[in-house]
Structures are given as C-alpha cells and as structure tokens.
Amino acid sequence: MLMAELPEPPTPTLSAIYASYEARQGDGFRDHLGASLIGKSCTRALWYDFRWATPARHTGRILRLFETGQLEEARLVRDLRATSATVLEVDPDTGRQFRVEAHGGHFGGSLDGVAVGLLEDPKTWHVVEFKTHSAKSFAELVGKGVALAKPQHAAQMQIYMHLTGITRALYVAVCKDTDALHIERVPADPETGERLLEKARRIIFAQHPPERISSDPAWFECRFCDHHGLCHGEDAAAITCRSCLHSTPVEGGWHCARHDRLLDPADQRRACPRHLFIPDLVPGEVTDAGDDFVAYRMRDGSPWTNDAREEEAAAC
C-alpha cells in the first residue's frame, strides 16, 4: 500500500520566526473584559476570560496573522484621508488611542479611530473600526451586512458609540485574499448599547459562571473555545488571584478578602500560597470547607482537597 506523501518539515528559519512571535505573546490574560469580546454568544466563556481561567495561547502563524491586521490599519487610514476625510487615530488631549471604560475600569476598549468629513455625511463624527477578513468571511459580510454576519464586531461598535456619545460608526473591512474593501455606516442603537453594558456588568460581578451555551462539547462554538478543556473536560483552571474565591472585582481594581488588600495586575498574576479555587472551577462536588481549605469529591469519585493550610507565606 502506498503511503501518503508527507509534507516537508518547516525550515529552521521558519520555525524560528514563528517561535519569536510566540515568545512575545505575553501570558494570555487581559486586565479588563474587552468591548471587542462582549458580543460573544457564550457568557460563560466571557466569565472565564475575565476570571483568567484559561490563558489564550496562539501559534506563531496566527499571531503573525493578527499583526497583519494591525499593519493594515495604517493603510486604511491613508485610504480614508485620500477621500478628504479627517481621521484621528489618537486622542489629541492624551496622545494615545481613544479609550472607553465602564464598570470601575473592568470593561472597556480602544477605538481604531474617529473620523469626520466622510462623503456620506461630512458633518457627523464617526467611530472607525477596521477589520480584515478571509474570502469566505468577506463574502458573508458583503451579503448579510455586519450586524448579521459579524455580530461581535457590531456589538463592539455599539459599545464604542454608547460610551463616547458618537452616533455613527464606520466599519471598514478588507478581504485578505483579494484586497477588496467593504464599508458600512452603522447607526448607534442606545438600547443595544445599554443591553451590552448590562451584559458586561453581570459577567464582571457574577460570583458563579453563567450557563454554558451548550452542554455538547462537540458544539461548534465550544470546539473552538479556549476554555473547552475546562468547561467540558477535566482541565484545571490557571492559578491566579482571579480564579481564587477570596478575590472580588471592586471599583478600579480587585480586592483580596483573605489579606484585606487591593491587588494590582502583577499581584493578580502571581497569586499566593493561600489561593483557593472558586469551587465552580473545580470538576467536583464540595464535601467540606474551612477558612483555608475546600474538600471535593471529584467526578470520578476520588477525593481531593484544595489545601492552603501550610505555613503562612507573604501576602499575595
């Protein structure tokens, strides 16, 4: 029997290029719940994101693809300015990207820019959002429009409009395969903006994870989720202050009840020896608990104790 021809292995140089991207990707945790994510259909996945249950990790090829999208933004700004539009990529008052925040700084995002002088409506300021698409995704976008084809992108723009008070958004999409452009003007919908803000509030301040979108681990949204192994399997959550039952989001940061102190982002990433998992993150049933331990009966019937009763170490 003839064997299928195996692909050539990557060259050392190619492997090194991808490895350099992977080395620079950080720890996979975002300090806030992002406006770019709030349109996700699974609220449990968003809660896991916010609680740093699973670090987001990507291959070098995917990270390079993300960078391509970022590099495209400068070209799209140039294209808009060629039409005589005024495009601001940074806030003149701060010299930084325009940024919106809500819920004590736990929710927010950064705008790609704002624009005025557009040919369709020269006097109205617009939130500007740039996105790159595969050929298949681009065709669906052109056929259905952003609200139906890319609800997560639409939600992101609604949040930006709602929190800036700008009444229009300009969605500029480029097909990575053909360089074709698609442009839509999107009106602000205050009701949708408020609903999305409330969704973010529920996720941020929820003590327990919301229901998963599907109990079927093979459901398409579940199969490609960063949290699949934790939500549907036996994977352990990452050990950070955010996965600890002692921590709570408060105005402007996080508070640890065990040590009665505020936690900066570096603290949150380090955790401490008194860390105890939020029980919802453990695949088992609580059988006993105390100040510094929680005992479980795991799904396979075995006992396990999340024990922090060792000699006190430095506060987290």
What are these model-derived regions, one by one?
Residues F130-S134, C175-K176:
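A short mid-domain helix/strand-loop element embedded in enzyme catalytic domains
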Residues E140, K144-A154, I159-H255, D260, ...:
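Metal-dependent nuclease catalytic regions and adjoining charged, substrate-binding loops involved
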Residues M1-V127, S134-K136, A147:
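Metal-dependent nuclease catalytic cores that hydrolyze phosphodiester bonds in DNA/RNA
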Residues K123-V127, K131, Q152, M161:
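Internal, hydrophobic cores of structured domains that mediate oligomerization or house catalytic pockets
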